[in-house]
């Protein structure tokens, strides 16, 4: 194969891809340095490159409006060897294993002798003499349960849906740097919002690699759209709404999103993409970040209310554009169908994104859930203290378990990578500000991390420690030994004193929304999907469940005589419990049937107030004022 067109040239079929000649376009610098990746040689500024040994790949996704139970996919390959492996990517965090829903796989070629064989759940072998073939399959969407839909999962409705991403495409194993084209066959009234590169055909898009392909899902349907620019870089907000959507002030929503982008650009000095797409979905929860887009649940009622929660989640996911998509843990490498190794660095990826979700909104003057940074820190410290696992489990250990398949990995404790990492960031930010007399902050750490670890090599915990030490000119090894690699409680007052504050902690009876004593629900049911039933996760051995002799991994049989069938049904039973109730639990452990009596006794929760230390110095007061303003 001599070449293929640049992304600016349309491609309806693979034949057109192969027939066109290669166009070489040298990228000229824009008026600003925004959105430009560092280049090491002038040859790297070529818009599209192809090796003669690479296959030509074209995908087609077809949505039939008369059957929205799934969609059809075809992948056309030319120029590959006689035997090819096709696979579906395993996501390092949210591996939903959608290969389970691939149906009716079949193959076509000019010889009529091609064969496709499933080798594993997410792996297929293709034998096609001549190396050219078309594989077709259907992705049968799973039935929705619980009345809620995750914003990152594919769906179809009469007015739109979400397709593509890791849930949809088979890729060629060993050819992850091969470019491809994707053509969408959709109802005529539907439009497309995706981070994939557009072509002259409005329904065809270009992906320079498998990673870009699977990290660029496509929101399709009757979309509302708004656009803005930051540093001359275009941003696109697409919204898919339900039929009963509540009207909201779209100008205010888009303005808030734009302010976040401006603050992030100001922090890092530039934007790392050529265009960004916000894929907002009504009737969905949660979100998932991508290198140049985000899939985010955005209920119209929350948008109408000006919800701080929506902006908080958006800011968190958007910050992942830098912190995870580019500044990535060393364990995160190129795509693979194999489950990737668990990362020890998610405390940084998730925790720092939580830290900046709050900070960027404050800098932008956007709604937040607490009036001041001090109040926000009070809430975070109280949450940390309320769960002993946060101090008994190291941030690195919790990172490894964060997206694991088995909640039993942490025993009868639970902990939050997001919370641990946020508080580690908060304390290190205070350390840096103190050591540099307010001249530097965590902002300087993020910029240096972006410069060093957004390329071929990801970061380790030692790298983070080294960068912080360089920025502050101080030693932080004892802190990392104790709270990142080790499992000791963070001594908050040691760092709060830099700004003339201390944490006053009191323990009070836990109350529900009605003001009455709350039931002790420091345990929850879960399922592993292995058909073994519902298990119990104890999050605190000092809870009523732990005191009754229950342990994480116990298989639940009945609660108060009600047979346990599903996780959702179990949650329904637990929500009916009140403080003072006595609960009879039938369970199985090690193949032995057992029973336990759980007494829903009252329990205490921590409340934290930041108080001023005695006789704070002028330097402490000045540093506090700078910190409270969220100054860089």
Annotated model-derived regions:
Residues 35-66:
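N-terminal, polar/Ser/Thr-rich
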Residues 63-65, 93-153:
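A surface-exposed beta-strand-loop module
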Residues 69-99, 170-187:
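Surface-exposed beta-strand/loop patches in extracellular or lumenal glycoproteins
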Residues 75, 225-346:
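Juxtacatalytic substrate-recognition/specificity segment
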Residues 92, 138-220:
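Extended, low-hydrophobicity, Ser/Thr/Pro/Gly-biased non-transmembrane segments
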Residues 97-107, 140, 167, 177-197, ...:
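Zn2+-dependent metallopeptidase catalytic core
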Residues 291-302, 326-327, 338-390:
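Post-HExxH zinc-binding segment in Zn-dependent metallohydrolases
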Residues 357, 367-632:
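C-terminal recognition in membrane/secretory proteostasis and scaffolding
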């Amino acid at each position: 194969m001599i070449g293929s067109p640049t992304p600016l040239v349309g491609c309806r079929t693979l034949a057109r891809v192969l027939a066109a000649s290669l166009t070489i376009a040298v990228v000229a610098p824009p008026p600003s340095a925004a959105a430009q990746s560092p280049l090491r040689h002038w040859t790297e500024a070529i818009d599209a490159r192809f090796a003669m040994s690479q296959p030509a790949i074209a995908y087609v996704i077809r949505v039939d409006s008369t059957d929205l139970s799934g969609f059809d996919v075809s992948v056309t390959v030319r120029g590959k060897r006689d035997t090819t492996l096709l696979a579906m990517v395993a996501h390092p965090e949210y591996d939903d294993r959608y290969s389970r829903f691939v149906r009716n796989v079949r193959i076509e070629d000019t010889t009529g002798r091609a064969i496709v064989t499933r080798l594993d759940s997410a792996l297929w072998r293709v034998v096609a003499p001549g190396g050219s073939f078309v594989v077709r399959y259907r992705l049968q969407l799973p039935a929705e349960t619980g009345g809620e839909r995750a914003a990152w999962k594919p769906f179809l409705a009469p007015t739109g849906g979400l397709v593509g991403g890791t849930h949809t495409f088979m890729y060629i194993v060993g050819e992850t740097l091969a470019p491809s084209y994707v053509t969408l066959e959709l109802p005529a009234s539907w439009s497309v919002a995706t981070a994939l590169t557009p072509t002259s055909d409005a329904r065809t898009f270009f992906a320079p690699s498998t990673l870009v392909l699977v990290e660029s899902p496509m929101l399709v349907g009757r979309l509302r759209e708004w656009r803005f620019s930051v540093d001359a870089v275009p941003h696109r907000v697409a919204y898919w709404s339900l039929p009963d959507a509540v009207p909201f002030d779209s100008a205010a929503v888009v303005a808030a999103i734009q302010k976040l982008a401006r603050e992030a650009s100001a922090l890092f000095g530039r934007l790392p993409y050529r265009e960004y797409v916000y894929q907002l979905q009504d009737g969905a929860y949660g979100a998932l970040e991508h290198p140049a887009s985000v899939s985010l649940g955005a209920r119209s009622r929350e948008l109408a209310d000006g919800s701080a929660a929506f902006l908080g989640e958006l800011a968190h996911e958007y910050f992942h554009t830098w912190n995870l998509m580019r500044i990535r843990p060393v364990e995160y490498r190129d795509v693979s169908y194999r489950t990737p190794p668990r990362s020890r660095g998610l405390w940084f990826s998730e925790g720092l994104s939580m830290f900046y979700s709050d900070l960027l909104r404050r800098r932008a003057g956007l709604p937040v859930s607490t009036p001041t940074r001090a109040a926000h820190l009070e809430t975070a410290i109280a949450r940390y203290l309320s769960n002993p696992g946060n101090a008994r489990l190291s941030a690195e250990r919790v990172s490894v378990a964060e997206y694991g398949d088995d909640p039993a990995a942490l025993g009868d404790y639970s902990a939050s990578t997001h919370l641990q990492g946020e508080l580690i960031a908060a304390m290190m930010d205070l350390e840096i500000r103190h050591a540099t007399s307010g001249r530097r902050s965590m902002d300087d750490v993020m910029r240096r991390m972006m410069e060093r670890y957004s390329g071929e090599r990801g970061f380790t915990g030692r790298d983070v420690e080294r960068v912080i030490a360089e920025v502050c000119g101080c030693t932080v090894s004892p802190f990392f030994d104790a709270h990142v690699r080790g499992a000791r409680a963070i001594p908050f007052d040691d760092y709060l004193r830099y700004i003339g504050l201390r944490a006053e902690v009191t323990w009070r009876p836990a109350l529900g929304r009605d003001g009455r004593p709350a039931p002790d629900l420091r345990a929850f049911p879960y399922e592993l999907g292995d058909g073994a039933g519902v298990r119990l996760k104890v999050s605190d051995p000092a809870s009523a469940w732990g005191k009754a002799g229950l342990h994480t991994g116990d298989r639940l049989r009945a609660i108060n005589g009600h047979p346990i069938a599903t996780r959702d049904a179990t949650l329904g039973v637990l929500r009916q419990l009140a403080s003072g109730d006595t609960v009879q639990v039938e369970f199985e452990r090690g193949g032995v049937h057992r029973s336990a009596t759980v007494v829903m006794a009252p329990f205490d929760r921590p409340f934290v107030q930041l108080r001023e230390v005695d006789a704070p110095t002028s330097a402490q007061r000045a540093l506090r004022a700078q910190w409270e303003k969220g100054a860089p």
